[in-house]
Design a protein with these regions (language model features):
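Membrane-interface helix-loop-helix junctions at transmembrane boundaries of multi-pass membrane enzymes
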Residues: 20-29, 99-108, 174-178
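Hydrophobic alpha-helical transmembrane segments of polytopic
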Residues: 88, 92, 112, 180-187
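Transmembrane alpha-helix/helix-exit interface in multi-pass inner-membrane proteins
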Residues: 112-130
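Hydrophobic alpha-helical transmembrane segments
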Residues: 80-100, 156-160, 166
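N-terminal transmembrane-helix/juxtamembrane module of multi-pass inner/ER membrane proteins
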Residues: 2-87, 124-142
Length: 245
């Protein structure tokens, strides 16, 4: 009986190891392809930022700012209102910790604040000029550079990770699940338009900012899944050993 249990345990262990190798092979290939696509997109976006003439950026901003109806300015300010990265992340992390979601809290912090920090460093590197009030309407003048947009990068990394957590953790039949997912997706989609409308960034800043955020979000999600997978495998082996005692 003991020998049979040992054989079954060894078979399960070998099966887990095989599945792990197969999963890593597929996962590694997908990771390389995704990283290459994002890198190519980022290079293209950087070229767009460097080569697009100022006249085009000014015309695009004025076209967006020509749209006017009651409440639009307030709505755009609301969309951009979650851009204070440290405060927003701290509040959410406290909520996740209270729900015993320590792993999610850690990676949300790494994704949100990490993306924001990277964007701030790149701003100093590129030192590109922001829109000025002599050519477009500027609702608030920031002292930092225009590219990349810290708001865009933060929104993609932070709300993108929250989207992943909500999709994974909220029950499929919950009435709040679609509402939460749509809200997060809309915030990510509209923040670029809001920054353009408020005269905070040029149109050429947006593609690279979205792609930079997508790259860092992908890295954080990949690490999160690897950590979660390792913990699940350890738990499976522990339960298997306990079951054969």
């Amino acid at each position: 009986m003991f020998d049979t249990n040992v054989m079954l345990l060894k078979r399960n262990r070998d099966s887990v190891a095989f599945n792990k190798r197969e999963g890593l092979t597929r996962s590694s290939f997908a990771a390389v392809v995704t990283a290459c696509l994002i890198a190519a997109g980022a290079a293209f976006a950087l070229l767009v930022h460097l080569l697009v003439p100022l006249s085009f950026n000014v015309a695009a901003t004025l076209a967006v700012q020509s749209i006017s109806f009651p409440g639009l300015q307030e709505f755009m300010r609301l969309v951009s209102g979650f851009g204070n990265a440290p405060k927003v992340v701290i509040i959410t992390v406290i909520a996740l910790m209270a729900c015993n979601k320590r792993r999610e809290a850690f990676f949300l912090t790494a994704s949100g604040l990490g993306g924001w920090f990277i964007a701030m460093q790149l701003k100093h590197l590129f030192a590109s000029a922001r829109p000025t009030s002599d050519v477009v309407n500027v609702f608030h003048q920031w002292p930092t550079g225009s590219f990349p947009s810290g708001h865009l990068v933060f929104y993609v990394c932070y709300f993108g990770f929250l989207y992943f957590i909500a999709r994974e953790k909220l029950p499929a039949k919950s009435i709040f699940r679609p509402l939460v997912l749509v809200t997060l997706a809309v915030l990510i989609a509209l923040v670029g338009l809001s920054r353009l409308y408020l005269g905070e960034h040029w149109l050429s800043d947006l593609p690279g900012s979205y792609l930079l955020g997508a790259f860092w979000l992908y890295v954080c999600l990949k690490l999160y899944r690897l950590w979660a997978g390792a913990r699940d495998r350890q738990r499976f082996m522990a339960e298997s050993i306990a079951g054969y005692r």
